[in-house]
């Protein structure tokens, strides 16, 4: 037939949607090692506001909590937090603590995540300090077409209403933000006027202000889909209360028995303000792909 033409080759190119639950299941199924993947779809449906809270839902992962009771460090397969490391988009990041190399995961807002990948087995392509495992935070990528997403939530903790306790605050100006050693160097001799005068004044409130959580992301592709741009931001302003019991134990003189010498039951009023922003640009060229990524995270507690 004159209308028929012989085709030598047909190439069909598709793009995988990594942020869906189906993609997460396929990634785990086809992985060469033991993986757990939390997709963006699952993260958005959960009430978790940071990466540490999201990891609590992953099997084989235990979270170490700080003094206020908030999840902070990941313990993979029962091994201490120093036996695993953290990646952002596949790149190892340093710790904000100058004495340790493990990362507090409660400083990363979950709104910025595209997916969360937890590797529980050491393979040849990993570094030697991944004996426990690896946590890879994959941030949002530019979509195939223009997309804008926004979310906002408001709520309140019933801890203070239910327990009948006041929410305590203080004036930040009453605190000395930096020690003289940090402000003036190790050779400086501290003076009395380098410190604030008087005790910190506590203010009592019937209840804290409402909690607010909000996020916004905008992405699109330009220049014939070769240039991708993704901008995202997140704000989390939360108030909560907690309590802990501390005790000191001593050995009774002349007896093989121990007793509690001091017992303290403390109540905490906590205000956490976490802000985060990230920008990602990618340029696709024939045979190459260039990516530039930057993230800003700040937590004030």
Region locations from a protein language model:
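Structural signature of outer-membrane beta-barrel domains
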Residues: 17, 81, 93, 155-159, ...
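Extracytoplasmic beta-strand/coil segments of soluble accessory domains associated
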Residues: 35, 52-92, 115, 120, ...
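Transmembrane beta-barrel architecture of outer-membrane proteins
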Residues: 46, 50, 71, 103, ...
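Short acidic/polar hinge/loop motifs at secondary-structure boundaries
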Residues: 63, 91-120, 140, 165-173
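Residue-level detector of the transmembrane beta-barrel scaffold of outer-membrane proteins
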Residues: 85-87, 115, 147-151, 228-230, ...
